[in-house]
Structures are given as C-alpha cells and as structure tokens.
C-alpha cells in the first residue's frame, strides 16, 4: 500500500469539495478546479477529511492510489494558496519585458520570443531578469515554466540562458590550451 495514498487530506475552512463518483470539483478563494479520477480509486469524505481508497490490489491500482491522493491534495492547495515557479535569466543583454499579459524574451536570438500565458496562468516580470509563473493548477504552472525555460536552456559552458530559481547548472571546463604535440 502507498504510504502517501493512505494519508487523509484535511479540507481547510473556505474550501468546498464536491464529489460525484470519481469526478471531484474543488472551489476556493483563488478559483475552481475539476478533475476526473481513475476508476481504480474511490474518494470519500469523512468529516473534515478526504480519504482516497484503492479498489483492488494489483500493481496499476497501487500506482494510481498514491497519485490520486497527491493530485487531490494539489487541487486543494491550489485553490487555497496557488502555486508559483520562479525563473531567472542569466547572460549579458538577455532580458524579459512585460507587454500586456504577454512576456517578450530577448535571449540572444536575432529575434525576440513572445510568450502568451494560457487561461489560468499569470506571468509577471521583476526587473528584467526574473520571471514568475503563477496559477492555481500545479501542472499548468510547471508546464508553462518548462516551456519558458526551453526557449533558451542554460548553456553548460558559460551558464547563460533561462533557468529555474535556485537551479544549479554544472559548468564544463573549456578546451585545454597548450597540451599535445608541438
């Protein structure tokens, strides 16, 4: 049995959870999230707690058991507090500018790259080198941050590019000069 899946989820005050079979809707101060869960798990409300239980004991059911509990917990945290991911731009002349709800990246290409956020995601720029992706759906926030990072991944020789805040980029040594045959 999954140790994560066995833990009950506390529903905080101000959060409304509607369970209709395997369809769950969570409403909170930040918004509303809905998700359909796999038939391998059942979701029940017991007082102030949500309990996820597996239907069988096969390998696939055990895998979806812990996953379903974590997805449900992320829905509750998202509508209560929201999620955000911070990105940093490293490199001379590389910058990001806000243009309405879009962000324009100038990261060393001959052209600038404009990124428009999908519904439910907000992009903000702090200074010219810090970008914050925020929203209530953890999957969407992470996906948007990954797409922005993929515009110009950090270079392993100089470290230039777009990286997650706090991400360590291992710098490779350059070519050794003066070695070999003369």
UniProtKB/Swiss-Prot annotation:
InterPro entries: Ribosomal_uL6-like, Ribosomal_uL6-like_a/b-dom_sf, Ribosomal_uL6_a/b-dom, Ribosomal_uL6_bac-type
Annotated signal peptide: none
Coiled coil (UniProt feature): none
Alphabetical list of Pfam families matching this protein: Ribosomal_L6
CC annotations in GO: cytosolic large ribosomal subunit
Keywords: Ribonucleoprotein, Ribosomal protein, RNA-binding, rRNA-binding
Any GO BP annotation: cytoplasmic translation
Top-level division of the source organism's lineage: Bacteria
One Gene Ontology molecular-function label: rRNA binding
Oligomeric form and interacting partners: Part of the 50S ribosomal subunit.
Similarity-based family: Belongs to the universal ribosomal protein uL6 family.
Database matches in NCBIfam families: L6_bact (TIGR03654)
General function of this protein: This protein binds to the 23S rRNA, and is important in its secondary structure. It is located near the subunit interface in the base of the L7/L12 stalk, and near the tRNA binding site of the peptidyltransferase center.
Descriptive protein name: Large ribosomal subunit protein uL6
The encoding gene: rplF
């Amino acid at each position: 049995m999954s140790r994560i899946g066995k833990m009950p989820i506390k529903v905080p005050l101000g959060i409304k959870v509607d369970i209709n079979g395997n369809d769950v809707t969570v409403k909170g101060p930040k918004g509303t999230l809905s998700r359909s869960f796999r038939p391998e798990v059942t979701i029940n409300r017991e007082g102030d707690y949500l309990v996820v239980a597996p239907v069988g004991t096969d390998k696939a059911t055990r895998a979806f058991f812990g996953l379903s509990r974590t997805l449900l917990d992320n829905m509750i945290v998202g509508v209560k507090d929201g999620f955000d991911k911070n990105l940093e731009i490293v490199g001379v002349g590389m910058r990001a500018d806000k243009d309405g709800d879009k962000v324009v990246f100038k990261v060393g290409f001959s052209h600038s790259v404009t990124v428009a956020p999908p519904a439910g995601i907000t992009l903000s720029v702090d200074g010219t080198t810090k970008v914050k992706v925020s929203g209530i759906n953890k999957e969407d926030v992470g996906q948007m941050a990954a797409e922005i990072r993929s515009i110009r991944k950090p270079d392993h020789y100089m470290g230039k590019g777009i990286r997650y805040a706090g991400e360590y980029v291992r710098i490779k040594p350059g070519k050794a000069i003066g070695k070999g045959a003369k």
